[in-house]
Amino acid sequence: MTVRKYHFNTKNQLGYYLAGLIEGDGSIKVRQGKKEAIAPIIVFTFHKNEMPLYENLKEILNSGYILVEKKGGVCRYCISNADAIIQVINHINGKYRTPKYHALYKAIDNVNKWRNANISKLPLDTSSLDSNAWLAGFIDADGHFSIKLAGSYGSDTSESLKKKRVIFLWESTVCILS
């Protein structure tokens, strides 16, 4: 897999990309009971083949740790530092599109209560999917594109072109299929 260095022209696109990643195959967990005062944790789940992407994100966010499970190639990039959680929440707030925003709102309530963060809950994003990097993050999390040729191209012949990696480009927000 080729790893490219990414150029971020605005932090805003990073937030859309992170929101897409979390909504695609990530989670925000808020502890309850006696552990409620501990900061929430953000977890991105991925396959070991995607390690360069998450190492790059870890470097960009300057926080977190990566866990590698012994079986199945499953990995998790976890962010649990309170200041880093607040930083990520500020990046992704207002950029969610799915019901996972409920977990984001619980995390905002938690950091507002225990860290005096004073973060407002922004509404769901309704902008066009081609206006930002959200879709790139969502597809990078757990997606692929397929093209099936049938009919006049061959009745029994079909070919699939599957996404190996959607590369996010912050400047143009274009997905490149390889």
Residue ranges of predicted features:
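Internal intein/HINT superfamily modules and their associated LAGLIDADG
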Residues: 1-178
